[in-house]
Amino acid sequence: MKVVIDNLGVVKHATIDLDKNILLFCGPNNSGKTYIAYVLNALLSQSPVLRSVMNNAVMKDQNGTTYTINITKELIVEYLKLASSYLQQNMGSIFGLSEEMEKSFFRSFKLECIYDDADYKRFFNDKFSLYYQADDRKYNGRKAKNSSEITIEISTM
């Protein structure tokens, strides 16, 4: 996936290829490295947007403890569009700025995510698991190789 950023402070245009194994931002002080890192972090961790997109894609088991999500390319693209739009409208919250300052600093900021068939094929072919713990709940997720479904089991501690 590629992320295209325009007019982010001193950064007039940047294309970041997230398919690389490592991303290294280097340059002189005040060249926009931190701004780009903040935007990428915010884009990839948009929980409210992710929840709204996933609501229609989730299938629960009868006990309500296991969820299966069928991740389609269209679902990923929808999420990325919503997350990009949300970020463009809420840049002040990322950088701790007032609404007035946000409008002044980021009025021409643009963010675009380019997600193509090759990206989805890599996702489809990958196998992974994840673990997350919050409050008194544990979340265990897994995705099998050559599958578009992610299964998440929720248990209490």
Predicted regions and their residues:
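P-loop NTPase switch/coupling surface
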Residues: 1-157
